[in-house]
Amino acid sequence: MTITAVMRSLAAAALLLVACGLAGAQETKPELSRVRLAVGGKPALFYLPLTVTERLGYFRDAGLEVEISDFPGGARALQALIGGSADVVTGAYDHTIQMQAKNQPIVAVVQLGEFPGYVLAVLAGKAQGYRSPADLKGMKIGVTAPGSSTQFMAQHLMVKHGLKRDDASFVGIGASASAVAAVQRGEIDAIVNVDPVINLLQSQGLIKVVADTRTLAGTRDVFGGAYPAAVLYAPRAFIEEKPRTTQALVNALVRALKWIADRSAQEVAAVMPPDYALGNPALYQQSIKTSLPMYSRDGRFSREAAETAYAVLKAFDPDVAGAKVDVAATYTNAFVEKAAAQP
């Protein structure tokens, strides 16, 4: 046998060993049986795939006990991760870019939403004098939590229309009944939130929508392109040290995305907690119907959409603007690709 033939045989054997190793790893249980997951505003339709995964028992089927802690907004969920009280987060993709800019590598492993569904609205009493985001100057704007992606949307539009990002004040109002109450009591001048909150406030005539990312066209109008929304992210160290646990989480979420894609709004609403409807089941079901197109069908990330998010953040966030961010390192499709092979 020639040296070349020997080398080829060794290479083939090595590939076989790798393949066997990967197959064995896939058959091995996750490194962790219990995972602590943080989320900011779980009743929001932004996070519907997470709740579907939980309610249908897909985490359990993947060999995981997932303990979900719900915080008032995404920034609080991120703080839980950084502080060590959470292992992973279901949150906005934006945070992966911001944390990399701070030399804290956070990586998104599955995309749940292909556009955000955020809506900027002014209260009815302010609607007559509103012409553009430049009129947000001096307003008190209710967001899910200070530092959350709902605040980023408002600041992006403000900077885009000649304002500074601190030309308005921001107050956290959550993403459920507390947000509705803040508007009803007139505690704020404008709001950035998601359905079902926005849909309910619209039905009551309390707000005027002025920017809407509940559709792809609206997202392009606001952000200039497709924009990643809800994702599952974790520290790079967790992903590298717990690859089977990460894969199990992704498998469960991708399974839920496939389930959602094949169901009607009525079927999806039936598995959600009744209190998420904010007292109006019919309107809630309609909100789900409107939101269904924004959920990913396969969990994959688009480089183009990720670059759009980076461009938006760089325009108003000095930390991002002053850092060298490798956008390709903020997400991975590796786990989603393996999940796609599931039956």
Place the predicted regions along the sequence by residue:
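Short, low-complexity disordered leader/linker segments with a strong preference
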Residues: 1-32, 341-343
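Short, glycine-/small- and polar/acidic-enriched structural segments
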Residues: 26-174, 185-195, 206, 210-211
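Extracytoplasmic/secreted envelope proteins and their assembly/folding machinery
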Residues: 47, 78, 93-96, 133, ...
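Short, solvent-exposed loop/beta-turn-alpha elements that line the ligand-binding surface or hinge
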Residues: 61, 128, 215-225, 293-301
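Pocket-lining segment of extracytoplasmic ligand-binding domains
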Residues: 178-274
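Secondary-structure end/capping motifs
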Residues: 239-320
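Conserved C-terminal helix/tail region of periplasmic/extracytoplasmic solute-binding proteins
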Residues: 310-343
